[in-house]
Amino acid sequence: MITVYRNSVQSWEIDQMGHMNVQFYFEKALQGCVVLWNKLGINDQPIELGNMYLSLSRAHIRFLKEQKPGAPFFLKMGIVELGDNEIKIYLEMIETITQLPCAAFNFQFVWIKKPSSEVKESFSKIFEELKVDIPSYGQPRGLSLEKEPLMSLSQASQKNMIDSFEAVILLRQCDNMKKIKPSSYMGIVSDSTPHLLAYTGTIDENGMTNVGSAALEYKFDFFEYVPLGTHLKTKSGVQSLSAKTFVWKHWIFNVETAKPVALASAVAVTMDLQARKSIPIPPEMAEALTKLIL
């Protein structure tokens, strides 16, 4: 694998749980991918966090260790699979001090523009150099990668789901083509969290209680990258529940078309925010989550 990114955690990247927010992990990994696009010569018309040839269709992320302000880290990348229709990329975020991985990313890109023979040749050459197998800590653990049937906004409204986000897409959430960035979809899901915490009783009018939650694993399917100004709504429910963890399902819809634009699944663990460790789900929280099981 090659190093494609090096930086440190910024204070403004910290969320209400006291650690780097998931959307910034995602954004940094996408920046690392741009290094590969540059190497391959497919970034002659740069798109922020993307390129003209490939579109991110699926992402799977494992969060292995929380990151605090000022923590230095770097990203390494390899290529898992090179096919006619898609490319699978693996990245690791590694702590500079411990040299241990703190996050693992699996990205699946699909071709949206037919590559030239030169681009194909470049990919074949670099694939031989960067071919990598996904280690056990980077593979799915609490989530299935099977495709799920789609549903409309009206179908979602008939289920045990809560409205967790609604807004129009702003310019700062878009790339230079004025289309929403993949990491902005992650941001939308993250921004919905306080509504979910309020429903489960772990946040009140005074802010956070001493109980919160942290994401251990995410899966994202991207169906459409909508343009600036698009009206989006997120419906959220619970897929499963155990003693310490639960799985959220977040469907993001285009309100105008009623079609899903992205689907996120997240394994979350209940967390004592003072001790910074996982705890069993409190009975009141478990009762609230049970009502949202799909």
Give a label for each model feature:
Residues 56-64, 74-76, 216-223, 234-235:
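Short structured motifs
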Residues 3-5, 62-72, 76-152, 226-228, ...:
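HotDog/MaoC-like acyl-thioester-processing domains
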Residues 1-58, 108-217, 272-294:
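Hot-dog-fold acyl-thioester-processing enzymes
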